[in-house]
Amino acid sequence: MKEMKVIIAGPRGRMGHEAVLLMERTEHFNLVAAVDYKHGGEKISDLPGMPALDAPIYADLHTCLEEVEADVLLDLTTPEVGKQHVTLAVERGLRSVIGTTGFTEEELKQLTETAKEKAVGTIIAPNFAIGAVLMMKFSQMAAKYFQDVEVIELHHDQKLDAPSGTAVKTVELIRQNRESKQQGHPNEVEQLEGARGANVDGIHIHSVRLPGLIAHQEVMFGGDGQMLTVRHDSFNRASFMSGVKLSIETVMNLDHLVYGLENIID
């Protein structure tokens, strides 16, 4: 397979660290640079626990793109920074794989239009775990037969956004196979605000944030005399790397924006 030159934004995070290790062990990936505002001017090998890679670190993406030739930007930063990075990448014609969440419908619409206009491949993935993507697809299938459903997503207590992008994407897929319906008793009253979680077209999403968790979600379907639970658990960040690898390889052949790994797996 042809060599792919990759820039990683956010190498110091747990996901970023796993991604650097992925670069090291994948023959056709070449980490040509990283972006980290705290370590501009250093090399990847200067960071604690990193492999001996000489890729330079830049304090900002704009400077990095001025000096480095790359095929793909892999962004694993925060939601706000990720939005800035993908916008810049698309405008510059650089393919990007974005692992941050929190995009609004309007932001996705604008990015989709710009990516199409520029003919630049872009993948935004709420979840890189292949198992999580299958969990979403199975939930979409089940929604055709079970109209009553609620979603519980559980993550580590350092996650900044709630509900998770995976939960939101799951509900979007379920809605495609489910008529609009308010879940629960029509006259129910919350004695404490938020007790029933977020409400998306009648589907409730409950967010849990605790130390010790990584990324987990269960989708609970209820029916007469039965219940179906579809659950996925990520126990470490290595679970996301197969999806990261697939995304980088796939985005090279795209000329538009794709939202969600379920749209690129067979």
UniProtKB/Swiss-Prot annotation:
Record GO biological process: diaminopimelate biosynthetic process; lysine biosynthetic process via diaminopimelate
Binding-site list for NADP(+): 38
Localisation per UniProt entry: Cytoplasm
EC numbers on record: 1.17.1.8
One Gene Ontology term of the molecular function aspect: oxidoreductase activity, acting on CH or CH2 groups, NAD or NADP as acceptor
Pathway noted in the entry: Amino-acid biosynthesis; L-lysine biosynthesis via DAP pathway; (S)-tetrahydrodipicolinate from L-aspartate: step 4/4
Record keywords: Amino-acid biosynthesis, Cytoplasm, Diaminopimelate biosynthesis, Lysine biosynthesis, NAD, NADP, Oxidoreductase
Active site as annotated: 155 (proton donor/acceptor), 159 (proton donor)
Keyword Cytoplasm included in the entry's annotation: yes
UniProt xrefs under SUPFAM superfamilies: Glyceraldehyde-3-phosphate dehydrogenase-like, C-terminal domain, NAD(P)-binding Rossmann-fold domains
UniProt entry tagged with the keyword Oxidoreductase: yes
Amino-acid positions noted as binding NAD(+) in the UniProt annotation, renumbered to this chain: 10-15, 99-101, 125-128
Catalytic activity: (S)-2,3,4,5-tetrahydrodipicolinate + NAD(+) + H2O = (2S,4S)-4-hydroxy-2,3,4,5-tetrahydrodipicolinate + NADH + H(+); (S)-2,3,4,5-tetrahydrodipicolinate + NADP(+) + H2O = (2S,4S)-4-hydroxy-2,3,4,5-tetrahydrodipicolinate + NADPH + H(+)
Gene Ontology cellular component list: cytosol
Group of enzyme by EC: oxidoreductase
Top-level taxon: Bacteria
Its job: Catalyzes the conversion of 4-hydroxy-tetrahydrodipicolinate (HTPA) to tetrahydrodipicolinate.
Name of the protein described by the UniProt record: 4-hydroxy-tetrahydrodipicolinate reductase
Organism: Bacillus thuringiensis (strain Al Hakam)
